């Protein structure tokens, strides 16, 4: 039985990652983060999981940015862009060990890397922004500084929890909105996906 390249890569990354190993006030829509530690308590609720991850990513964004996912391009213009999949494994490992992200989040990111790499092989380039990497691949946006400056000013615009699945729509500082999808595993909530909302609707 043939296994697709994406499916095979997903199985590989799962094996690699497996081997390596606030509170909400009574107004309901105002979140207060009590601490930034990666503890079981901080990941025991949907809100704390989201804010815990955002704080973690804010504090580790520069470190993750030092992992060069792309080879080629400037200053060697004769070498086309291509993915460094050794670097991507390290990048995904660092994300996974944050303790906030589900296997689904990690696997979808890995699939995205493969799709971008396939695009670069079909349409070679050695300069300029790369389609699919011309925004922050975690925050799913180019401009998300309003999130960092408003982690203590967050409102819940929509919330739906059904057994082990959850969805929250959050607003940061009265402007930036994003949707968060989570799954509960072993009594802890993990992020499956982040989708920005530019509709302007509440």
Regions found by a protein language model. Name each.
Residues 1-5:
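Positively charged n-region of N-terminal signal peptides that target proteins for export
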Residues 6-14:
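Sec-dependent N-terminal signal peptides
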Residues 17-18:
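C-terminal motif of bacterial Sec signal peptides marking the signal peptidase cleavage site
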Residues 8, 157-159, 171:
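Residues embedded in well-ordered secondary-structure elements
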Residues 162-168:
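Short, hydrophobic/aromatic-rich segments at coil-to-beta transitions
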Residues 173-175:
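Glycine-centered tight beta-turn/hairpin loop motif at sheet-sheet or coil-to-beta transitions
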Residues 167, 177-202:
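Short beta-strand edge/turn micro-motifs at domain boundaries
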Residues 23-161:
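Flexible low-complexity loop/turn motifs enriched in small/helix-breaking residues
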